[in-house]
């Protein structure tokens, strides 16, 4: 079963779900602009993925938020790497959750190429941060873009 299409027509989680139900082994090649990623299935189970410097489930989550680009499924191509140990259902649920989260964020942040910076505030203002938020704040340096920071923290 050769399958190909556009991510603007079908989301990657939906396409993976369709192919995985058939129990196929092969690879999804996913591309947009100058980025290319791969998601490997063995007997219908997602076992490995890579895009850029990301591997495993983080690579799947990154590609799942792509709304533009193309995909093709090449049956029979295998990998010896097993970097994903989640069930397809859990992997796709997390991908869908991140996609929903991304849709909300993308309305508030017009571009990942923006460089965040601190503004001066009255020192009497008290700010309370969670450990997760504190890690993020420590990466803001007036030089790196939102995308750079997300990549550094593996939050993309």
Predicted regions located by residue number:
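Acidic, Ser/Thr/Pro-enriched low-complexity segments and adjacent helix/loop capping patches
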Residues: 1-156
């Amino acid at each position: 079963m050769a399958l190909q299409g556009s991510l603007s027509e079908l989301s990657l989680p939906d396409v993976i779900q369709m192919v995985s139900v058939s129990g196929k082994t092969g690879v999804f090649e996913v591309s947009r602009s100058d980025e290319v990623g791969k998601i490997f299935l063995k007997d219908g189970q997602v076992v490995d993925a890579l895009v850029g410097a990301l591997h495993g489930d983080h690579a799947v989550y990154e590609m799942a938020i792509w709304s533009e680009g193309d995909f093709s499924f090449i049956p029979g191509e295998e990998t010896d790497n097993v970097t994903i140990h989640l069930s397809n259902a859990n992997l796709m649920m997390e991908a869908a959750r991140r996609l929903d989260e991304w849709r909300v964020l993308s309305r508030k942040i017009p571009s990942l190429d923006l460089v965040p910076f601190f503004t001066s505030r009255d020192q009497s203002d008290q700010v309370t941060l969670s450990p997760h938020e504190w890690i993020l704040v420590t990466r803001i340096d007036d030089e790196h873009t939102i995308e750079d920071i997300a990549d550094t923290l593996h939050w993309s």
